[in-house]
């Protein structure tokens, strides 16, 4: 069971935690209504017919939400991501933390994991803070 949970978490980070970025390729919509919406595809956002509420109304909204450095990180974000970053110390090890300014996970050499915003790995940080893995 634990193996399944770990695989699910890692698989979720590959496409990003924001599932709204992914095109569900819905065949049938309620009332047959389809709208032009934008979804992440590779390094950009592209328009595609979708059911109301799927994807984003504009390419700009999609890019802000689906790429590191921009977007709505309110979905599935751990509160520790917004704590103070770890400080440096002589006996410290490599510590990963979330930088809210750049909306990325960064590594601090010789960091003291005394901060709430300290993660054991970049993947752990990305999963907790909703950062897409590139």
Swiss-Prot record:
<dbReference type="GO" id="GO:0090729">
    <property type="term" value="F:toxin activity"/>
</dbReference>
<feature type="disulfide bond">
    <location>
        <begin position="105"/>
        <end position="125"/>
    </location>
</feature>
<dbReference type="InterPro" id="IPR002223">
    <property type="entry name" value="Kunitz_BPTI"/>
</dbReference>
<protein>
    <recommendedName>
        <fullName>Thrombin inhibitor savignin</fullName>
    </recommendedName>
</protein>
<feature type="disulfide bond">
    <location>
        <begin position="29"/>
        <end position="51"/>
    </location>
</feature>
<keyword id="KW-0968">Cytoplasmic vesicle</keyword>
<keyword id="KW-0964">Secreted</keyword>
<feature type="disulfide bond">
    <location>
        <begin position="81"/>
        <end position="129"/>
    </location>
</feature>
<dbReference type="GO" id="GO:0044562">
    <property type="term" value="P:envenomation resulting in negative regulation of voltage-gated potassium channel activity in another organism"/>
</dbReference>
<dbReference type="GO" id="GO:0005576">
    <property type="term" value="C:extracellular region"/>
</dbReference>
<keyword id="KW-1201">Platelet aggregation inhibiting toxin</keyword>
<feature type="disulfide bond">
    <location>
        <begin position="45"/>
        <end position="62"/>
    </location>
</feature>
<feature type="disulfide bond">
    <location>
        <begin position="89"/>
        <end position="112"/>
    </location>
</feature>
<keyword id="KW-0800">Toxin</keyword>
<feature type="domain" description="BPTI/Kunitz inhibitor">
    <location>
        <begin position="83"/>
        <end position="129"/>
    </location>
</feature>
<keyword id="KW-1203">Blood coagulation cascade inhibiting toxin</keyword>
<keyword id="KW-1199">Hemostasis impairing toxin</keyword>
<dbReference type="GO" id="GO:0030133">
    <property type="term" value="C:transport vesicle"/>
</dbReference>
<comment type="function">
    <text>Tick salivary thrombin inhibitor that plays an important part in the anti-hemostatic strategy of ticks. Inhibits thrombin-induced platelet aggregation, but has no effect on ADP- or collagen-induced aggregation. Is a competitive, slow-, tight-binding inhibitor of thrombin (Ki=4.89 pM). It requires thrombin fibrinogen-binding exosite for optimal inhibition, as its affinity for thrombin lacking the exosite is much lower (Ki=22.3 nM).</text>
</comment>
<feature type="region of interest" description="Linker">
    <location>
        <begin position="70"/>
        <end position="82"/>
    </location>
</feature>
<dbReference type="Pfam" id="PF00014">
    <property type="entry name" value="Kunitz_BPTI"/>
</dbReference>
<feature type="disulfide bond">
    <location>
        <begin position="21"/>
        <end position="66"/>
    </location>
</feature>
<dbReference type="InterPro" id="IPR036880">
    <property type="entry name" value="Kunitz_BPTI_sf"/>
</dbReference>
<keyword id="KW-1015">Disulfide bond</keyword>
<feature type="domain" description="BPTI/Kunitz inhibitor 1">
    <location>
        <begin position="17"/>
        <end position="69"/>
    </location>
</feature>
<feature type="signal peptide">
    <location>
        <begin position="1"/>
        <end position="16"/>
    </location>
</feature>
<keyword id="KW-0732">Signal</keyword>
<keyword id="KW-0677">Repeat</keyword>
<dbReference type="GO" id="GO:0004867">
    <property type="term" value="F:serine-type endopeptidase inhibitor activity"/>
</dbReference>
């Amino acid at each position: 069971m634990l193996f399944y949970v770990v695989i699910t978490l890692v698989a979720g980070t590959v496409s990003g935690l924001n599932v709204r970025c992914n095109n569900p390729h819905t065949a049938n919509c309620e009332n047959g209504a389809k709208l032009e919406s934008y979804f992440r595809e590779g390094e950009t956002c592209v328009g595609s017919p979708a059911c109301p509420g799927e994807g984003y109304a504009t390419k700009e909204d999609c890019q802000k939400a689906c790429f590191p450095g921009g977007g709505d990180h309110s979905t599935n974000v751990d509160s520790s991501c917004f704590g103070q970053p770890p400080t440096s110390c002589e006996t410290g090890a490599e510590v990963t933390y979330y930088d809210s300014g750049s909306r990325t996970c960064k590594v601090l050499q010789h960091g003291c994991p005394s901060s709430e915003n300290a993660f054991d790995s970049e993947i752990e940080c990305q999963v907790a803070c909703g950062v897409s893995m590139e």
